[in-house]
């Protein structure tokens, strides 16, 4: 078994912003638990067309063994579109690659990575149990704060907001049709 102090995890969050936040929260907990250094490679792509720093400020509280930076070419999950080249190149550097949109859990990751010094994880799922609240870990960037304050300054009284995913997720639309949102709004 390899000492946790010599382990390095590179975590590439996938999916939309909400999924990425859950993955980052798992990565933070992985670092906080002392399993090694954790580097989150945040890619700006069609799934989430923003950089981390465009939306969020610093992660709090900061950890010495945890950082978030823009993804590099080699961090990209393998796909037909990139001819699987990043994955092939990564085999030269990483001892273990956990790819895809499968759900991983703490025990499975610890078992699989027990003899690996460098581990690559690309997922859209939470993979490390945590009780950390999103609001305690993530803070909005100055630009987002300013935009929200500007928009909400005009609100009067009590306001209820809805986020409706209408174009990108057919199963979600089946489970949460517009009529359900309308009924909930009327109850409020």
What are these regions (language model features)?
Residues 9, 38-40, 119-121:
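Hydrophobic beta-strand residues in large extracellular and virion-surface proteins
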Residues 13-22, 171-173:
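A short, glycine/small-residue-rich beta-strand->loop->alpha-helix junction that serves as a flexible
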Residues 34-39, 188:
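A generic structural motif
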Residues 2-15:
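Nucleotide-activated donor-dependent transferases that construct or modify glycoconjugates
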Residues 37-47:
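A short beta-strand-loop structural module common to alpha/beta enzyme folds
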Residues 50-188:
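Secretory-pathway luminal glycosyltransferase catalytic domains
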Residues 20-32, 181-187:
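Histidine-anchored nucleotide/phosphate-binding helix
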């Amino acid at each position: 078994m390899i000492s946790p102090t010599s382990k390095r995890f590179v975590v590439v969050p996938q999916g939309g912003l909400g999924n990425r936040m859950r993955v980052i929260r798992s990565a933070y907990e992985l670092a906080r638990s002392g399993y090694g250094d954790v580097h989150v490679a945040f890619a700006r792509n069609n799934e989430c067309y923003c950089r981390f720093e465009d939306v969020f400020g610093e992660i709090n509280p900061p950890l010495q063994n945890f950082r978030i930076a823009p993804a590099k070419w080699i961090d990209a999950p393998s796909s037909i579109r990139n001819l699987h080249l990043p994955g092939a190149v990564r085999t030269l550097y990483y001892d273990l690659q956990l790819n895809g949109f499968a759900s991983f859990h703490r025990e499975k990751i610890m078992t699989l990575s027990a003899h690996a010094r460098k581990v690559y994880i690309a997922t859209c799922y939470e993979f490390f149990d945590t009780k950390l609240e999103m609001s305690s870990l993530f803070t909005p960037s100055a630009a987002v704060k300013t935009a929200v304050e500007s928009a909400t300054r005009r609100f009067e009284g009590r306001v209820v907001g809805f986020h409706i995913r209408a174009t990108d997720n057919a199963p979600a639309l089946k489970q949460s049709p517009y009529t359900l949102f309308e009924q909930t709004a009327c109850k409020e």
